[in-house]
């Protein structure tokens, strides 16, 4: 069914998830077949009962994992502006227009996907941390967001084809990278023409302990650093950078747009189209 285009195969460690494909013309056939199955079908009822048990188990495991990381999570959040204030400013930057397809790189708990759920046609979150993916998946399932999914993926080598998304977001993720320009180039690769990349991260700071205690590779970024990365990735910079001053960390929102695919095609990873197989 994967080869026929009815299902997508999403490897995650030793496990493999499957979902109905929504990326080609055969996906409508899959949805039509599903619609023909009566809700009272005995096998379907048993399957749904088992699915609910699996979801409950996932939610419990996700909550257990989050309890383990909650202290460090809250310690970081206490250093900058409240989360809701940051969400509001992000929505302001995105604007009121319809988004289309969204890619959240380093999705964590899936919060960005959730707050934009009613504005997108389809949402994908990628993360390397299986524990965080479990939290995000549980949150998305509990919210009933069937047009959103998460999968394991590396920000340096996204499991996506070229020019497949309209908006990519790196929300408080880039400071974990030892090579930010490559992350931004990879994000540019998957953007469609006129697609946008939004980076939310810390302004340059001197809180050195964040390296050792929280594994931050970079102590924030200057405007020039991000702008240079955007330009190197073939993106057109939006000069309207947003700033939310916190104590001691200030959060900034930079954004840029892809005017054409020419700049990224030369940097495209030739293996990209094989990653979903």
Regions found by a protein language model. Name each.
Residues 101-105, 109-157:
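Class I SAM-dependent methyltransferase SAM/SAH-binding core
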Residues 11-17:
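Short, Lys/Arg-rich nucleic-acid/phosphate-binding segment
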Residues 25-72:
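Amphipathic alpha-helical dimerization/coiled-coil segments
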Residues 181-196:
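A short glycine-rich, Lys/Arg-flanked "PGG" loop and its adjoining helix->strand segment in the class I
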Residues 156-167:
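A short acidic, Gly/Pro-enriched loop at the edge of an enzyme's catalytic core
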Residues 166-179:
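A short SAM/SAH-binding and catalytic strip from SAM-dependent methyltransferases
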Residues 81-100:
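Conserved alpha-helix/loop element of class I SAM-dependent methyltransferases that forms part
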Residues 196-255:
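C-terminal alpha-helical "lid/dimerization" subdomain adjacent to the S-adenosyl-L-methionine
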